[in-house]
């Protein structure tokens, strides 16, 4: 996926926020085909790895599910080693003739680490514990970074508020938000 081309990202916003001992992964429910909303309650955030890992995806749905299945297989091979599983998936994604054609991005997190995975072979861990991908990702990221300094807000509170802001701004993001908490 050309991560510089927002056209490939239409239809999703995924946000991961880590604060204190809590991790919240949120995703909106809108699926768009061109300029048309075809579904408003899609579930783009999932628990994987025996429930110890949360993953969110942006991009082509079939491609994202293929990558999610591959990541689950890597987690079975490398239990409790999210970083290693992500690196192994990224290597496969980059070098496999079939996988490298997949157009999706993933945000994955466990209780201690969070990563963005791209088809370019990137496994990126944020410095501030916040990841955002998809068409509304930059809006959600900016909102979450502003809200992280507010005392008394949990990771879930920040994720929900930032997703609302992203949904207010991005036409490819709606307010039907799914949140998974670790």
Curated annotation (Swiss-Prot):
Top-rank taxon, per record: Bacteria
Activity control summary: Allosterically activated by HslU binding.
Catalytic class of the enzyme: hydrolase
Record's GO cellular component terms: HslUV protease complex; proteasome core complex
Residue ranges of the TM segments: none
Keywords (A to Z) from UniProt: Allosteric enzyme, Cytoplasm, Hydrolase, Metal-binding, Protease, Sodium, Threonine protease
Keyword Cytoplasm: yes
Biological process (GO), any one: proteolysis involved in protein catabolic process
Catalytic activity: ATP-dependent cleavage of peptide bonds with broad specificity
Subcellular location field: Cytoplasm
Residues reported to bind Na(+): 167, 170, 173
GO MF terms held by the record: metal ion binding; threonine-type endopeptidase activity
PROSITE patterns per record: PROTEASOME_BETA_2
EC number: 3.4.25.2
Active site residues according to the UniProt entry: 12
Keyword Metal-binding: yes
Signal peptide from the UniProt entry: none
InterPro entries noted in UniProt: ATP-dep_Prtase_HsIV_su, Ntn_hydrolases_N, Proteasome_sua/b, Proteasome_suB-type
UniProt-listed PANTHER family: ATP-DEPENDENT PROTEASE SUBUNIT HSLV (PTHR32194:SF7), METALLOPROTEASE TLDD (PTHR32194)
Quaternary structure and partners: A double ring-shaped homohexamer of HslV is capped on each side by a ring-shaped HslU homohexamer. The assembly of the HslU/HslV complex is dependent on binding of ATP.
General function of this protein: Protease subunit of a proteasome-like degradation complex believed to be a general protein degrading machinery.
Family assignment from sequence similarity: Belongs to the peptidase T1B family. HslV subfamily.
Protein's name according to its UniProt entry: ATP-dependent protease subunit HslV
Recorded name of the encoding gene: hslV
